[in-house]
Design a protein with these regions (language model features):
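CN hydrolase (nitrilase-like) catalytic-core segments centered on the catalytic cysteine
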Residues: 1-86
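A generic membrane alpha-helix/interface feature
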Residues: 19, 57, 88, 108-110, ...
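A structural signal for well-ordered alpha-helical scaffolds and beta->alpha junctions
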Residues: 24-28, 92, 118
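Residue-level signal for alpha-helical context at structural boundaries
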Residues: 49, 91, 114-117
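A short, polar/charged loop-to-alpha-helix boundary motif
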Residues: 83-100
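Cysteine/selenocysteine-centered motifs that mediate thiol-based redox chemistry or coordinate metal-sulfur cofactors
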Residues: 96-123
Length: 123
């Protein structure tokens, strides 16, 4: 099973030097955590390029870096840079079953406790 997670995330040019590495690392970490929590492959797909604002000022720079992580969060394929890429990675369906059996987040979830999840505040 593969979860395709399309994103359009990047940074403003003024933030790149100070926050760029942290932001990109956080994006990769959360995508990989989706793999682990759900026991599936995740294709973290991200837009590339630079968007100029209507007034001509610099807009968001999308960093690309699309990747595929296995059900344990290991990156098995990734785009090498911020250019447009087609990423190919090998998917082993038996790995999904193996990880779910030995790392059973889905099996052990407490769905009976989900009732309040749609509430903004829990009293």
């Amino acid at each position: 099973e593969i979860l395709f997670y399309p994103t359009a995330i990047g940074w403003h040019p003024e933030e790149k030097a100070e926050f760029g590495h942290q932001q990109q690392d956080a994006w990769r970490t959360i995508q990989r955590s989706h793999s682990i929590a759900n026991g599936v492959y995740v294709a973290g797909v991200n837009r590339v390029g630079h968007e100029i604002m209507i007034d001509g000022t610099p807009g968001i720079e999308f960093w690309g870096r699309t990747f595929l992580s296995d059900p344990f969060g290991v990156i098995v394929a990734e785009a090498p840079d911020e250019s447009e890429q087609i990423v190919y990675g090998e998917v082993d369906p038996s790995r999904v079953e193996e990880v779910r059996r030995h790392w059973p987040f889905l099996r052990d979830r407490r769905i009976d406790e989900y009732g309040d999840i749609t509430k903004r505040f829990i009293d």
